[in-house]
Amino acid sequence: WMETFAQRGGQLVIHGAAVGDLDYFSRTYDLVLVSAGKGELVQMFERDARRSPYSQPQRALAVSYVHGLGPRPEHPDTEGVRCNLVPGVGELFVMPCLTTSGRADILFWEGIPGGPLDVFDGVKDPAEHLSLTLGLMERYVPWEYARATKVELTDAGGTLSGRYAPTVRNPIGRLPGGGLVLGVADVVVANDPITGQGSNSASKCAAAYLASILEHGDKEFDETWMHATFDRYWDTAQHVTKWTNAMLAPPPEHILNLIGAAGQLQPVADRFAN
């Protein structure tokens, strides 16, 4: 995509960026969009407490990219994401993916902070990280561990751990020089990854912003336009945020009953999944 952008006449510059750079950009260009994960740039955008019910991380996250995972026993010929719920402990997601070394799988623990899965802080050695992951699988999801006995990391960078509070932010960043910038994707809506909606939501944010830019024509991209543009994205994103935050809380009894029924009754499973 970056190559296509450049081929079509865009100027692609790969360089570190600080708030001072954004000051310059805001004076030079009609509109500056900020896409970032965390750090100085994200701190310009204030947390929206009204839309952010959690002020602390709700899961301790640990990811391993592996080769050698066995097929799904129920559906050995098809790919799919598997979600294992361990009440009071957390969740294990198993996801197929592509990485620099080809086809791989992701073993992704989401642990309740302070619980038995919250053991990855300070673990820097990738082999130790994978060993912890597999040990927890053997204890809590032995059916998944049974097909993971021969896995190995895709590479030395195949592990990741951390945590963050799910946060919705004010979409407008105010620069020291008086300029305004508009946040994009995770800058403005950073949901927990428990629902796996980060990339989808970022794409929908880009599409909503593009539509607003094209519709605006040659008029100024002022503060009113920025708020309206974010609100257009939030019309979709709010439902993802609500669903994701609900997944972080203990499931109510009717949800457990629904999932249990879906495991026994095919018509319920079909309606639930589709």
Where are these regions (language model features)?
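Helical element adjacent to the flavin cofactor pocket in flavoenzyme catalytic cores
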Residues: 1-14, 26-31
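Conserved SAM/SAH-binding loop
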Residues: 15-21
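Short, well-ordered coil/turn residues at beta-beta hairpins
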Residues: 16, 35-36, 48, 184
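Glycine-/small-residue-rich beta->alpha transition segments that form the dinucleotide
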Residues: 29-31, 35-40, 187
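Central beta-strand plus flanking loop segment that forms part of the substrate or channel wall
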Residues: 45-82
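Conserved FAD/dinucleotide-binding core of flavoprotein oxidoreductases
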Residues: 86-159
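FAD-binding beta-loop-beta segment adjacent to the flavin cofactor pocket
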Residues: 160-189, 193
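C-terminal helical "tail/cap" subdomain of flavin- and related membrane-associated enzymes
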Residues: 195-196, 210-274
